Amino acid sequence: MAQVEYRGTGRRKNSVARVRLVPGEGNITVNNRDVREYLPFESLILDLNQPFDVTETKGNYDVLVNVHGGGFTGQAQAIRHGIARALLEADPEYRGSLKRAGLLTRDPRMKERKKPGLKAARRSPQFSKR
């Protein structure tokens, strides 16, 4: 018998997370490492588990994630987005609660590009009066 698996892709800033949900006991594996080993802050792990809290499915699925690009925060939020999309594939009834929590919306905020003549995106060179 083929194993049931739900997939979701999450994105945030420059991070892309490919998430697979498999019925299990709630283990989260990120890039073949345990999530507590991969992410340095407990707050990021709590953030990542939000879709399970909203849908009350904590401990029902094992999560397998491949994530690349960006930093820890962007990656954690990309994983959260991917988990929400995979849960939606698992049961379309979750759409309302996930949507209300804002977990299905891709956060469009990106790093602003550096402009010519400036030191950074908005930081101008130091002004000298004399």
Swiss-Prot record:
* Any one GO MF annotation of this record: RNA binding
List UniProt keywords, sorted A-Z.
Ribonucleoprotein, Ribosomal protein
Regions of biased composition (Basic residues) lie at: 111-130
| PROSITE patterns on file | RIBOSOMAL_S9 (PS00360)
Question: Which Pfam families does its entry note?
Answer: Ribosomal_S9
Q: Which GO terms describe its biological process?
A: translation
**GO cellular component terms, A-Z:** cytosolic small ribosomal subunit
Per the record, which residues fall in region Disordered? 99-130
Instruction: Identify the domain of life.
Output: Bacteria
Output the InterPro entries linked to this UniProt entry. Answer: Ribosomal_Su5_D2-typ_SF (IPR020568), Ribosomal_uS9 (IPR000754), Ribosomal_uS9_bac/plastid (IPR023035), Ribosomal_uS9_CS (IPR020574), Ribsml_uS5_D2-typ_fold_subgr (IPR014721)
What family is it from?
A: Belongs to the universal ribosomal protein uS9 family.
The cross-references to NCBIfam families, in alphabetical order and at most eight, read: PRK00132.1 (NF001099)
The molecule here is called: Small ribosomal subunit protein uS9
UniProt source species: Staphylococcus aureus (strain MW2)
Gene field: rpsI
